[in-house]
Amino acid sequence: MKRKQLSGKHIGIVFGTFAPMHVGHVDLITKAKRANDNVLVIVSGSNTQEDRGTRAGLSLNRRFRYVREVFYDDELVVVDKLDEAGIPAYPEGWVPWVNHVKELISKNTDNPEKITFYVGEPEYVTELNRYYPQAQVELIERSIINISATEIRDNPMENWSFITKPFRRHFTHKVLVVGSASGGKTTLVKDLARTYNAPCSLEYAREYQEKYNVRDDELDTNDYIHLLTDQYAQTSDIIDKGQHSGLIFADTNSTVTKVYIDYYLKENISQEEFDMLD
């Protein structure tokens, strides 16, 4: 996919760690978009344990991908990342940090006439005016949507409605019920899903075998490849839709399917075929 470049003459800049991005962030970016031709969103941080997002399981790369996903259909917004690994702590780090920001602006825009930063801390106003005097800096009031990323990390379920959909997959509780065949797993999972008003992912093999009218002892390598990939896709789709309250149930997953493959097929297929299933 060709990299999109912002062609507007007035560019708004919004930066942050976005761990996670919530609707308050989106509200701010929307306001910046209304006041400018385009907005460049910069996801900052690092993939090290010094980064609070990474410590919470949201690496810089993952946050960057998720924020891009939030704005996948917005032609007025471009998302890029700033890896702060190796940049000294503030205040010493301001000069290299601003230089990195300038590089991102040059990379993603076409010689804008006006650049405006939207920040939430007075310190940012002072330092950006000092090290980037060509740009304007606006200190914004906190969004009327009263939520913070810290509150979400501390209690994601209570603040579920504030989390943007791509980030919900990270905070979703996934309950897998395991056990032997014909042991009542599916019934239990359905009952739990009804009780907690949550979606469930059932064993895809049943649907597959009914659709293609194939018995257990007739399943071959190609069938198991479909079972592995489609089981994973089915559960992932439920999680990724984000149309739940942070809880899903499953009566199997691709790992369980792989165990059955190891048991039933390993002695009957070539090593090359077996490796395809890993």
Name what the model sees in each region.
Residues A181:
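The conserved Walker
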